[in-house]
Amino acid sequence: WSSDVCSSDLDYAHRRVLGLSICMKSGFWKEAAMRIDNLTLKNFRNFENAEIPLNPKMNIVIGNNGSGKSSLLMGALTAASTFFLGIDYASPRSIKTEDVRHVAYETNKIYQQREVYPVEVSCQGVINGNACTWSRSLSGPKSNTTYGAASDLKKIASELQKKAALPSSQTVLPLIAYYGTGRLWAQKQAKQKEKQKLKSRFEGYQDCIAEQATDKQLMEWFSDMTLLVSQEGPIPQVSAVQRALERCFADLIDHDETQHVKVEYRQRYRAIVVEYVNRNGEHELHPMSEMSDGYRSVLNMVADIAHRMAVLNPQLGDSVLETPGIIIIDEIELHLHPGWQKRILNDLTTVFPNIQFIVSTHSPEVITSYKDANLILLKHEGSATQIDSAYGKDVNTVLRSILLVGDRPIEIEKLFDKFSELLHKEDYAKAKEVLENLEQILGYNDPSVYDARNSLEIEQMEWPE
């Protein structure tokens, strides 16, 4: 890590790495595991009553616009954040007015809508390695979200908080985080008093499920840790965060294109800096804040996840990236080049092996990239269906068979449909005109044009009786 730092007192930074020398036993993450195995949404947004089994590692939510992808993610976030009922330093997401399902009805030819209650979010899952069920509900427009059916989860979280607050505690705190579509641009204004109020492991939960992002806490942590490393020497969990960023950047830009990737915070820039040698042997250095949207979107998210793990569980040292938890990401492909979309899920699960990911996407590259993903297909009527793995399938096949989108522009699809219709009617002269139009647009050797030409020639052949 860079020695390019200014001096200041180290007290705050020291307190953030208490417990550094603790040696955790192997397999700690199994005892600390957190995940949702089954999510049920009743009258939640456009879901009347949907039961959604989830994979412990990777869940990909797909569907057309308006089918409920973001709604499902909000339901999952409502469920996962229930853990914060037992944590004094974070608040769970409540069931809100906009979460209530509406149904339309007609009275004397006038269409109206009514709200449908109760709204319920319920789960079966694992918390701190123990099987657990919990539920939250909203019974009416003037009611508050109930928590009675989540008492077991609240008790587990409260006990974890008490144990984690003890000196030299080995208790592992799970990470819960949400990254919405505004994660790059919708910056939340951080409060000045927040740093004074939170000086503990639980700072890792600050704004972790906020719909608007803030990098203030992230930059403060990097600044403090860089200063501490320059004074005290290497800190294992800080090195782990650094490695996470270096690996992701190298994967994004392609290992063959770069060498000697180094990521560090530099006080001179007041930013995280990426330094590497490119394929031409030239040295490059870029502040992360000045990089393209694609790089910043991924690196900011990875940095935020990794540093929160380091704050929550400094006692894990070099194994801090094995922190368990649940991370929810809306439109995982946001700002990413198609080549990066193919790698992002595998990168995330490799760097953070004990996290359960629930992500939404429109991208066929993302859908086909992960071997054992749980694919959840949503339709406009509020249904959620598990479908077979699309791993390794042709992108055009996914567009047609899963996303129900043609792999050509609509105008071209219509021309091919017209050609087939004319061929069926044996109107070969007009079919030939359409074919010639397609040849001009797509080229004589286009595979689909070639097939159409063969079909026309076969239909026009005179067969012996």
Model-predicted regions and their roles:
Residues 17, 23, 27-33, 203-322:
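Extended helical coiled-coil dimerization/tether regions that scaffold
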Residues 330-331:
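Walker B catalytic acidic pair
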Residues 346, 350, 365-465:
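RecA-like P-loop NTPase motor core
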Residues 323-325, 354-357:
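Loop/turn-to-beta-strand initiation segments
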Residues 361-362:
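Conserved H-loop
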Residues 13-217, 233-237, 423, 443-465:
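P-loop NTPase switch/coupling surface
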Residues 1-7:
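Short, small-residue-biased leader/transition segments that mark boundaries at the very start
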Residues 337-338, 342, 369:
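Conserved D-loop-proximal element of ABC-family nucleotide-binding domains
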